[in-house]
Amino acid sequence: MKKFITTAALSFMVMSASIAQTNWKLDGSHSKLGFSVTHMMVSETEGKFKVYEGTVASKTDMDFTDAKINFSADVNSINTEDEKRDGHLKSPDFFDAEKFPKISFVSKSMKPNAKLGKTAYTLTGDLTMHGVTKTVSFTAIGASQTVKDPYGNIKNGFKVFGTINRKDFGLSWNAALEAGGVAVSEAVKLDLNIELNKA
């Protein structure tokens, strides 16, 4: 009987360890969700979303293998430092913010990428934008360690980057140039700086 109880206790400890996780919340005041596109085939136009939120559940403070990530951004918060352009981006020509006010991302896997470093991962998940959901992959480079801020918050962070094709999500507006080519590139580069607070 004693052996059975000991075995059961050990099994419970192993199960508890396997389901233990560290929860994080995105710190919006110290993060940035940026993007850029090629304009007129000669320069980069940059923008960002100013309102967004997200949560992360990782195995430990530093192990984000197969972390569970949920993220959303408010399309109406788009900012390219030009009100007229921002208005056009919110219109049915692009995001159609009135009909599709949110962009969301839900992770499917997060695998270590040793070629890029000890804290590098390939992040794959479902990106939903303009009413279309596609599976996409990004590179995520984590901080080398956690830190505690002056207010007692435990922090970690990631730089996440990659490229998507806006036409895959139905954002197909463009204008042809006289010399050939188009006004706005189909490729959109994403560049996120993410700071997390341990929940």
PLM feature spans:
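Bacterial Sec-dependent N-terminal signal peptides
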Residues: 1-23
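Low-complexity, acidic/polar, glycine-enriched regions of mature
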Residues: 20-199
